[in-house]
Amino acid sequence: GYDFDHTSISTQDFMDRVNTYWIQEYNIDGIRFDFTKGFTNNSNSGWDIQRQVLLKRMADTIWSVNPDLFVILEHWGDNNEEKLLSDYGMMLWGNTTYNYRQAAMGYTNTSNFSNAVYKNRGWNAPHLISYIESHDEERLMYDVNTFGNNSQPNLYNVRDIDVGLQRAELVSAFNFLIPGPKMLYMFSELGYDISINNPCRICNKPALWNYQQVPKRKRLYDITSSLINLRKNHSSTFNTKDFYYSLTSRTKRLILNDSIMNANVIGNFDIWHRNVIPNFAHLGIWYDYFSSDSLIVTDQYMSLTLAPGEYRIYTDLKLNQPSVTLSEIENQDRNEGINFYPNPANDFVLIDFQSLNNIGEANFQITDMLGRVLIQSVINNYEFDRVKKIDVSQFDPGLYQMQISSEGKTFNRSIIIE
């Protein structure tokens, strides 16, 4: 079709007038340009000096009007050219939706989303805008609901809506806490699951505001908000250049080092329990961001066991616990009356089973972070009107996992022994 002569002064003047009008009239703080790889009179090759000169000229004019304005490019050029434009001060979209979707669906062999990290592309500046969803890509939760890993449907079925939304949390924890700007597509924070192709790719989609009243979706909204607030309120940590990542395997981790606060993000993307070594920056007390539980680290290379889809964000500064809607499992535990205390504990833990008196028996066990079973027993029906006392006086200080299973339901809790 027809195209502008990008080298024409008239074309450049027109572009500058339009950009300046939007900046001054509407006080916008950024402009995203579609397919800037086409801003040239040459072919859409991966490396084009004419295009580079034209884009720099346009950006300079924009910054002469507002030096702080975000210039965002949907470019899709060679990495060398994108790096050059990034070094100049422009931000570029980084499409990692395929790998994020594979990770959320539980297909770990294709779940490496390292390309969402600007360092992984050899860039100097954190100007890579990574994202989970966009207007051009399929919805994460549609794929999770439709194609998620269901190879163990009776144990852990990714296609179950509760499991799928938890895995959306897992992916979000990494996406939003990897240093660099992010793009959040509309309703992603509520697990929008209407396909991009329903009824057609560019057809209007329903605005499902009622998702706000669905607790399991409201929880994802709360988690997303809490993640963004965490990085905003602790920008020194989450903008640090001193960070490391391991995103290629079934368990993934992100390590952020900073003089004010260190942080570790760990997650299990498999459909089985897995051990992960967070590689804590130092010994001492670390805190789980969402639960506010403390973890005493006596070995920097200690291993933690994560359930399928589980993630944790540890900081070495105690933060205010965010307000998050309870998950289905947490609500179930609360409704069924399972409670234990004290936590942290020293010599014993008291477990309250009083609301479980309608079942025959339950299997109970406590494991350490290596997965070794330390206590295992069967709790019979007559015990359910009591508070059971568990002796933990012989346990070394650290984090342990308590599991209660009955009639297909499993309740997991973390216990800290001091």
Positions of PLM-derived features:
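An active-site-proximal structural segment forming one wall of the substrate-binding cleft
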Residues: 4-31
